[in-house]
Amino acid sequence: MRFFGEVPEQYDYIEFCRDEFVAILPSNHMLTIHDTIPISKLKNETFILLGKDTKFDLVCQELFRSTGITPRIRLMGRCPENIIGFVGMGMGVSLLMRRHAEFFKTPQITIREITPTAESRICLIWKKNRPLSPAAATFLKFLQE
């Protein structure tokens, strides 16, 4: 499960990895010369973002609010690979999680770090004080070794 912030107290967990938002730009975009881009530099861009029914959208919108940006949104989608394709065609820029961006990267896009960013944690979680099934206990033991 992906968490932005802390895992709720009622759960135990094993953290597998962390992830962060990055900027996805067409490879010929003028900001690709920078290794890190302040979000404020994207204020005049047209965005292609993940849809409003995702946790990513809530966090992304908070990043915009925290930097005083009202994004111009051309398109919202559900699939990171489609968003990356549209960015690669020059239809706009995007903010996506680094792992999505790296997995679906094409020569037509460039990935850049942003400031500020938001970090997520990908974890296996289970309820505290609740016995695990034998299969779940075996799986958990396997992961912990």
Residue ranges and their predicted role:
Residues 1-9, 70, 76-79:
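Central regulatory/effector-binding core of bacterial HTH transcription factors
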Residues 3, 45-67, 132-140:
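Secondary-structure junction motif
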Residues 65-74, 108-109:
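A local structural motif
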Residues 38, 59-60, 82, 120, ...:
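Hydrophobic alpha-helical segments typical of transmembrane helices
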Residues 6-20, 34-35, 81-128:
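Beta-alpha-beta core module
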Residues 25, 35, 60, 105, ...:
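Short, flexible helix/strand-to-coil boundary loops that buttress conserved ligand/catalytic motifs
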Residues 49, 75, 93-94:
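Conserved SAM-binding loop
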Residues 10-52, 119-130, 140, 144:
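Hydrophobic/proline-rich hinge and linker segments of small-molecule sensing/allosteric domains
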